[in-house]
Amino acid sequence: MPLLDSFTVDHTRMAAPAVRVAKTMKTPHGDTITVFDLRFCRPNLEVMPERGIHTLEHLFAGFMRDHLNGQGVEIIDISPMGCRTGFYMSLIGVPEEQRVADAWKAAMSDVLKVTDQRKIPELNEFQCGTYHMHSLEEAQEIAKHILDHDVVVNHNEELALPKEKLQELHI
């Protein structure tokens, strides 16, 4: 099995909250797709609660588009990481990390403005695969955590696992 890019960085050294360009690629038509690692929690030390991350998934996708789309950027998808420490965001374009961080903070402010769980988009059995597994309160606690901290930039070159370590790990 090929080694995925996300497993070549040292998770023990990742800061959070932080933005990291996880990958860039060109489409056959020459568009640049950028994948961002939006790290909400320090890996192996913190984790977002499942109901909160699920609710945040519903809210974050729309709010980030409100604040980041335009000026050569269009979000394709925002999805939670299975480890529940962050989200991956794929988009067309190459925005600066600070622009992404600013949009992230603005989106978290929007999450705090949601006043009722019934206002969560697509919160029904027809549009959500686990529509009972939500918590606006937990999503707002996650958002507040981001707003209470600086969003920094994680750089791949600073987090790269040495080849010797990858070999030691049998990768």
UniProtKB/Swiss-Prot annotation:
Cofactor, free-text remark: Binds 1 Fe cation per subunit.
Keyword terms of this UniProt record: Autoinducer synthesis, Iron, Lyase, Metal-binding, Quorum sensing
The reaction(s) this protein catalyses: S-(5-deoxy-D-ribos-5-yl)-L-homocysteine = (S)-4,5-dihydroxypentane-2,3-dione + L-homocysteine
Entry's EC annotation: 4.4.1.21
Any one GO biological process: quorum sensing
Cofactor dependency: Fe cation
Residues the record lists as binding Fe cation: 54, 58, 128
Entry function: Involved in the synthesis of autoinducer 2 (AI-2) which is secreted by bacteria and is used to communicate both the cell density and the metabolic potential of the environment. The regulation of gene expression in response to changes in cell density is called quorum sensing. Catalyzes the transformation of S-ribosylhomocysteine (RHC) to homocysteine (HC) and 4,5-dihydroxy-2,3-pentadione (DPD).
Family: Belongs to the LuxS family.
Alphabetical list of HAMAP family matching this protein: LuxS
Subunit annotation: Homodimer.
This protein's name: S-ribosylhomocysteine lyase
Species of origin: Serratia proteamaculans (strain 568)
